Regions:
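Secretory targeting signatures
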Residues: 1-2, 44, 50, 180, ...
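Individual alpha-helical transmembrane segments in multi-pass integral membrane proteins
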Residues: 3-17, 33-113, 148-149, 204-222
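Alpha-helical transmembrane segments of polytopic integral membrane proteins
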Residues: 18-22, 83-86, 156, 160
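C-terminal ends of transmembrane helices
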Residues: 21-30, 86-90, 167
Length: 240
């Protein structure tokens, strides 16, 4: 019997992101804090992304018609979720440019979803692990590289910001949480490299992508869930 490895790992991710969403939402309601609200909505959308992906993966569904319908939704949920979190971070660091940052990130969401409305990669399974490839070069191919161009730049900037927050934080739990976010985002960057270069081009087994997802989810679970506490306003306003 083949075990749906990717599906089980993504299911774990669903619980992690939804739990984080609940925690930040409670913080938002208690503190009436704008940043906590964006984090809550962002984690909720990312969790929805994994719900949409996990359902067919658990049952090894590789029907192109199914993925053609689901792909625009999960890409929209994933991109929108991280964009909300990124907007909360960058708009607090550069408040005078918050509107421009919002427009920029909105364009990234639209450009990321656009190609999946016209073309969907081929999804298949290798020993219970989800893999994907391009059967042919689509006419919207340049748009597929939008996330791979801007996401590393955005994640790299956020990694630096959270490392600095961890370095300057006085509260131990705040320090752990900021450091955990930075490390998790580093592994997200590593995951992009694994997916795009090693697996797609280098023909490496896709299980390494799953392992990277598992590392990210585990880091988030330990650093954010188990070190959670209702932050005081002076910390939240600094995104700590």
């Amino acid at each position: 019997m083949t075990i749906p490895t990717t599906g089980l790992i993504f299911l774990f991710g669903v619980f992690v992101y939804f739990y984080l969403s609940i925690k930040f939402y409670r913080c938002y309601k208690e503190e009436d804090n704008r940043i906590a609200k964006f984090f809550s909505y962002g984690f909720f959308l990312i969790g929805l992304n994994y719900v949409v992906e996990t359902a067919p993966i658990l049952f090894f569904i590789d029907d192109p018609g199914v993925w053609r319908i689901l792909a625009p939704f999960y890409v929209c949920f994933m991109t929108s979720g991280w964009v909300l979190i990124a907007y909360a971070v960058f708009s607090s660091v550069l408040p005078s440019y918050s509107k421009a940052i919002g427009v920029f990130f909105s364009c990234i969401v639209l450009l990321s979803v656009f190609p999946f409305l016209f073309y969907t990669p081929k999804y298949f399974y290798v020993n219970g692990v989800l893999d994907w490839s391009f059967e042919s070069i689509p006419h919207v191919a340049p748009f597929f590289f939008v996330p791979f161009v801007f996401t590393p730049l955005i994640l790299s900037s956020m990694i630096i910001i959270f490392f600095l927050k961890a370095k300057n934080a006085q509260n131990r739990k705040v320090k752990i949480r900021s450091l955990g976010l930075a490390i998790a985002m580093f592994f997200m960057l590593l995951g992009m490299f694994v997916d795009l270069i090693l697996i797609t081009i280098g023909d490496v087994h896709p299980v390494y992508s799953d392992l990277n997802y598992l590392v990210v989810f585990t880091i988030l679970a330990f650093t954010l869930i188990f070190s959670w506490f209702p932050p005081k306003s002076k910390y939240v306003t600094k995104i700590e």
